[in-house]
Amino acid sequence: MKIGFIGLGNMAQAMIGGVLRNHLAVPEEIYGSAKTAETESKVHEMFGITVTGDNLETARQAELLILAVKPQFLEKVIGQISDIDLTGKTILSIAAGKSLAWLEEQFCAPLPFVRAMPNTPALVGEGCTGVCYGSRVTPEMKEKTAAVLDSFGKTVELPEHLMDVLTGVSGCAPAWIFMLIEAMADGAVAKGMPRSQAYECCLLYTSPSPRDRTRS
């Protein structure tokens, strides 16, 4: 399957890494474009994917087109690519707050749309991603898209009205927990404990079973 990424920031890099680690595609089947040539060069060096330098070309090449840009830039990106023939392509957006209906309105076309919300632990392959599928996504593409999302963590399929709820739980909560751990460690360091030990004592250790989790 050919996969295209418009936007090659941290989340796109996490997704590309997961796809390659799980052998869902080879680098030659992954296309990408970014706002700057520096980002494209960096991602090409990291993963060996094809960088196009052109959102239109990325869209043309992809079977699964992933819109990995921030919400404030999404409308502009869609405007750049919506006039080409996107028949047969599945469009996956990871922009927060942009509904399936909004995507269809912007593209002015009845395409297969997917909305997903990954979180920052995806950067280390431990993400929790909420996903909802539009009615035009075929079972085959749903399976392939789910495999991509599963490649960097756990995926939870939800009705769309719960996507914003998920954002509050899994999108923001990891950052809050990281800040709490940092603050606890800072307190221990202030009392003379080495930072490495402070972090170790603050972290939650996780076994294969959530029931076996213990705090150290």
Language model segments and positions:
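Aromatic-residue-lined binding/catalytic grooves and analogous aromatic/hydrophobic interfacial grooves
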Residues: A173
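Single conserved hydrophobic/aromatic residue that forms the stacking wall/gate
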Residues: P208-S216
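A structural micro-motif
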Residues: M1, E28, I49, K89, ...
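NAD(P)+-binding Rossmann beta1-loop-alpha1 motif at the extreme N-terminus of oxidoreductases
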Residues: M1-M46, V51-G53, E126-G127, V189-K191
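Small-residue helix-packing motif on alpha-helices
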Residues: I30, E40, T58, P194-C202
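Internal alpha-helical scaffold of NAD(P)-dependent oxidoreductase catalytic cores
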Residues: W102-P112, C128-V165, I177-S207
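Short, well-ordered alpha-helices that flank and scaffold nucleotide-derived cofactor binding pockets
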Residues: Q13, G17, R21, E45, ...
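Rossmann-like NAD(P)(H) cofactor-binding subdomain of soluble oxidoreductases
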Residues: A37, M46-F47, N55-R60, L64-V131
